[in-house]
A protein has these predicted regions:
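Cyclophilin-like peptidyl-prolyl cis-trans isomerases
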Residues: 1-251
Length: 251
């Protein structure tokens, strides 16, 4: 999703997330946060934030008004899927309810052989871009992270731009919103975002198990055929039940 990622990076450079807030925490679904409104914009109720979880816009929550402005781009292209050509996909090895699935470069992906396309799956810790009803695709000023069972029905409907590889437990531990769709009813309930910086500023180092490696293939088999405690191994696994191993390493 190069256009959406570029828009998010522009918002970070402009400091638009500094002073923003976590506006929504819906149990077994998503944590959502918003940048400060751009010049000439104002906080509104419901709106794009409500649609970030695949629901219709519902009053009661706090969202950020959208529209063009400095560091606030116009409607971006729909980046819900991409050509599968060029991707090295390690098959999941189990039947998936939604589409043939696997892993590419450490990312959970699904594909459609008829259209020749592939897309990032909505799994735990995935980060997506909130949007309003089509043709709106979101501008990157509202983002969410999945904190529950993978809402795969959102696949190819909302742009997935990344995933949380460190700190998702802090998101999951936030108090749930008591308003519709998990929005906080008042600004006092929200968690204020002090600042957002690129990871390169802190230079953390992480290693991800290569999904094209023999070790990853063995890992998939182990997830599908568990031993020890298990009396009856499932013999299969769900795409979102395979957490790609990530570890932080010393510099």
């Amino acid at each position: 999703a190069p256009a959406h990622i570029a828009a998010i990076r522009a918002l970070v450079v402009a400091g638009r997330f500094d002073g923003g807030a976590i506006t929504r925490v819906q149990d077994n679904y998503v944590v959502q946060w918003a940048a400060r409104p751009g010049p000439g914009k104002m906080l509104t109720s419901g709106g794009a934030a409500a649609v970030a979880a695949g629901s219709t816009a519902t009053p009661g929550g706090v969202a950020v008004g959208t529209g063009p402005g400095p560091a606030h781009p116009a409607i971006l292209p729909a980046e819900y899927e991409r050509p599968v050509k060029g991707l090295q996909i390690t098959p999941l090895g189990s039947t998936d309810t939604y589409a043939p699935s696997g892993f590419a470069d450490g990312w959970p992906v699904a594909r459609d052989s008829k259209t020749g396309t592939a897309w990032l799956a909505h799994c735990y810790a995935s980060v997506g871009v909130g949007r309003d009803n089509p043709p709106d695709t979101g501008d990157g000023s509202e983002l969410y992270a999945v904190i529950g069972h993978g809402p795969r029905h959102l696949d190819r409907n909302i742009t997935v731009v990344g995933r949380v590889i460190d700190g998702i437990a802090d998101f999951s531990a936030l108090p749930r919103g008591t308003g519709p769709l998990g929005f906080y009813k008042t600004p006092a309930e929200q968690t204020v975002i002090t600042r957002v910086r690129f990871a390169t500023a802190a230079d953390p180092r992480y290693e991800v198990l290569a999904s094209a490696s023999p070790a990853f293939a063995a890992y998939l088999q182990a997830r599908a055929n568990r031993t020890g405690f298990f009396v009856r191994p499932a013999g299969a696994t769900d795409l979102c039940n395979v957490q790609v191993p990530v570890r932080r390493v010393a510099k």
